[in-house]
Amino acid sequence: MKKIVALVLAVLMLAALTGCGETVSGSDKYVIGICQMLPHSSLEEASRGFQDALTAALGEDQVVFRHQDAGGEYATCATIIDGFLAENVDLILANATVPLQAAVSATDTTPVLGTSVTDYATALNMPEWTGLVGGNVSGTTDLAPLDQQAAVIAELFPEAKNVGLLYCSSEPNSVYQVTRVEGYLTDMGYTCTSFAFVDVNDLSAVCEAACAASDVIYIPTDNTCAMYTENIANVVLPAGVPVVTGDASTCAAAGVATFSISYYDLGVVTGEMAASILTGEADISTMAVKSVDAATKMYNPVNCEKLGITIPEGYQPVA
């Protein structure tokens, strides 16, 4: 009997010791929840860069990623974030504005890093913006120099008069970009008209209206536009209206040129931030929002040929 009792106690002690220090993955690995807004290439590249950088910093055997896509739905973002919190993940990557908003609403303790977010002040309703979110939130911004995006239009289409600004009205960061770019273009002598659509159901109709009224169209970094680039291309290319975009993925399908950052590099910066937070080298509450150092002029050779547009030196083919 004593031997049986001793054996039971030994098993219980072993189980207790095994449970010490475990994370949700059942090991001592860091568990990272990634909530990505949409399945398009810019966001995919940001997620990939993040995972590569964090894996390189911590070691492949030290980190596990839970990567989920919200399919463009806010409610799904909230559900994904709630699932991560229930699982007690070590850090959340919110890839795009809506996942960031959902994560900030859901937790003030679990570290949250945003990426592919254009303007944190707008996204988080912080009018007194200092570059620091504070608390348990920081991240990276994908905001390329908007004055340089306007300058691309001036360089390629100096004879144009009317610029259509096409964007999704439900994306606050798109409104921010369009407002800024409109100011730059107006100062350059262009007449700008906004063409805002609600969702994919009215995108084609709004795009047709933009084509009818515009010599050239500008599309900001807009996740909804990026998800439905084929819909846009099916309207603008037959209409013969060139599109300058805020990101490379939209340009690759529907545009002729862009001045864009590398979303992979953006993800790398975010992954390096995550590593410093998880290892205790940095305090997220004092970590300012970061960006990548450079943006690149790119063009779409296929669409330029279709529309008879000659691109000057200094532009790289979009991937």
Language model: regions and residue ranges:
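An alpha-beta-alpha
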Residues: I32, F50, S138-L185, M287-N303
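Short, low-complexity disordered leader/linker segments with a strong preference
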Residues: M1-V31, A56-E60
